[in-house]
Amino acid sequence: MKCPFCGHSNTQVLDTRMSEDGDAVRRRRRCEACDRRFTTYERIELFFPAIVKKNGSRVDYARAKLKDSMRLALRKRPVSAEAIDEAITRIEEKLLALGEKEIPSSQVGELVMRELRKLDKIAYIRFASVYRSFEDVSEFSDVLAEVTAGSGKR
């Protein structure tokens, strides 16, 4: 591996360990030329399916975009950043498990709605109202009835 300080191509691995979450190998290295030390990480490269939008265009999957849309729905709701990240990870695991090269954005939207429903009913309704493009109050009422019936409250 090339030294980031002097560019020399010979480095020595001093220590190799698994990261805490087990998804990376951490290596401590020393440059044989300048004697400086640095750390490298080796991770699995995951390939998410391309997202096919309603207009037929294709975009790369972007975790940040998914996180932004979920955070918007969860704004001012009592849900931790950690819980949001865990939900996004579950969505990503489902996307990878599909084994497809492309998936429609509607499928991602449905996965997001399922996770939001588990996290916070209000956020679920907020997201559903935008995602499903509610045209009138009756559509809103239908989703409210569905959520309250599912939680045993009326």
Swiss-Prot record:
User: Cross-referenced InterPro entries, in alphabetical order?
Assistant: ATP-cone_dom, NrdR-like_N, RNR_NrdR-like
Q: Zinc finger (unnamed) residue ranges?
A: 3-34
Q: Where is the ATP-cone domain?
A: 49-139
The cofactor(s) it depends on are: Zn(2+)
HAMAP family, from UniProt? NrdR
Q: What function is annotated for this protein?
A: Negatively regulates transcription of bacterial ribonucleotide reductase nrd genes and operons by binding to NrdR-boxes.
Q: What is this protein called?
A: Transcriptional repressor NrdR
Source species, please?
Cupriavidus taiwanensis (strain DSM 17343 / BCRC 17206 / CCUG 44338 / CIP 107171 / LMG 19424 / R1) (Ralstonia taiwanensis (strain LMG 19424))
